[in-house]
């Protein structure tokens, strides 16, 4: 089985600057530990966050044609030394569902997704998939058809957000998917600030990389 872990980084946020080498080494060492190729993309034709987020889905589609298992992790995701082999734990399209409530920053994503589905006469859930960590393969990306359905998503919601769009597509077209356990996308933010042993991959939303487990 061929495997790849890929990520991408642009210096759009100076909070990363002094930790770039540390993060890359942690991600690369995790990939090598479990026999996966590691790829860090630094696209020079992208200069904004939205295009960077779109690019990771397009890259996943490309890699799914070349590798049996594809894992994307944001560059603010740091694997812990005790993290087991994720490739033995997940399969197909696997993402972590968040359940934002009113007043939370993520809540607006949920509302956009629900409005898109409602406009198509579809039922909807109360979650949004976080794409900071996701696993996929050729079959799951072929079913998702993200690139093919991008124009449809933009017509329904011109304000681009990759998590809104991918959540809409999964629900609208009933794409097969799996829920990624929280331990693989252990989000650190204003609610959970300090990394701990519960997480295998610590996702530093708050960018406080000096906080280590």
Regions found by a protein language model. Name each.
Residues 1-67, 155, 159, 172-174, ...:
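N-terminal anchoring/stem segment of glycosyltransferases
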Residues 5-6, 39-41, 71-74, 94-96, ...:
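A structural signal for short, well-ordered beta-strand segments and their strand-loop junctions
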Residues 14-15, 46-49, 79-82, 86-88, ...:
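Short catalytic/ligand-binding loop motif for oxyanion handling, primarily in non-cytosolic enzymes
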Residues 27-38, 119-134, 168-171:
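A short, hydrophobic secondary-structure junction motif
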Residues 52-109:
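GT-A fold catalytic core of metal-dependent nucleotide-sugar glycosyltransferases
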Residues 54-56, 107-113, 193-200:
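Short, surface-exposed amphipathic charged segments that create phosphate/polyanion-binding patches used
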Residues 84-153:
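Conserved catalytic core of nucleotide-sugar-dependent glycosyltransferases
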Residues 126-213:
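Catalytic core and acceptor-binding pocket of nucleotide-sugar-dependent glycosyltransferases
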